[in-house]
Amino acid sequence: MRILITNDDGINAPGLEVLAEIAAEIAGPGGEVWTVAPAFEQSGVGHCISYTQPTMIAELGPRRYAAEGSPADCVMAGLYDVMNGDAPDLILSGVNRGNNSGENALYSGTLGGAMEGALQGHKAIALSQYYGPAMATADDPFDAARRHGVAVVRKLLAADQWGGPGYGTFYNVNFPPVLAAGVKGVRAAPQGLRSHARFRVEAQLSPSGRRFLWVQGSAQNVPAEQGSDVSLNLDGYISVTPMRADLTAYDKLADLEAALA
């Protein structure tokens, strides 16, 4: 099996090393793991692409590349340049340092990489490690992802719930904020929304009097709807959410059509 991996934390991020281990085991003997990851931190860039400027790419080693662009840029670089058009069997993005459940999924560069893979017609999975108090003193904060990642990916590949008409399906996997031994299981889940979940900006003045705005997030350990990815993660479960890039609110179409008549 040929696997392309990327992330949004950057080429030197420890989560990418974990993902490379997961990918190598999935690929198996004789398989190939190709890495194309951002040269610099790209957290929060979502599904953006470098449309108005070129992306510089550098080879760091065998099948290992860093690109000065977003995760979506990296996926395209892998598909159309690095892998010479020889398509991968699977695209993996992560393992993100921090959760991408709930509203975080909308901002995530990790999901942006997986989404681009799906839009390009490939099987794609995003993997993220929820952080919590257990991680602060852990020798390996990615313990849950490292120990359970291979099994989850294999289950998704075996389920064959891919493709379909229109936008392709990709998967958002979030490992709970516990060590591997504390994981209760794996559950399918819808995307949740934390109560009062809003990003905001706070202003600070530099010594020279210049005004800077810093993005601030909201509390992450806030429960969402029962059974959602957020609530399941906080309860110790790995969540798996099937996703598509289609943003249409289908439940509003009929009423909108009537209002526009």
Swiss-Prot record:
Among InterPro entries, the record links this protein to:
SurE, SurE-like_Pase/nucleotidase, SurE-like_sf
Domain of life, source organism:
Bacteria
Residue intervals passing through the bilayer: none
Catalysed reaction(s)? Answer: a ribonucleoside 5'-phosphate + H2O = a ribonucleoside + phosphate
Question: Which cofactors go with this protein?
Answer: a divalent metal cation
Q: Which GO terms describe its cellular component?
A: cytoplasm
List UniProt keywords, sorted A-Z: Cytoplasm, Hydrolase, Metal-binding, Nucleotide-binding
- State its location(s): Cytoplasm
| Biological role | Nucleotidase that shows phosphatase activity on nucleoside 5'-monophosphates.
Protein name per Swiss-Prot or TrEMBL: 5'-nucleotidase SurE
* Gene from which this protein is expressed: surE
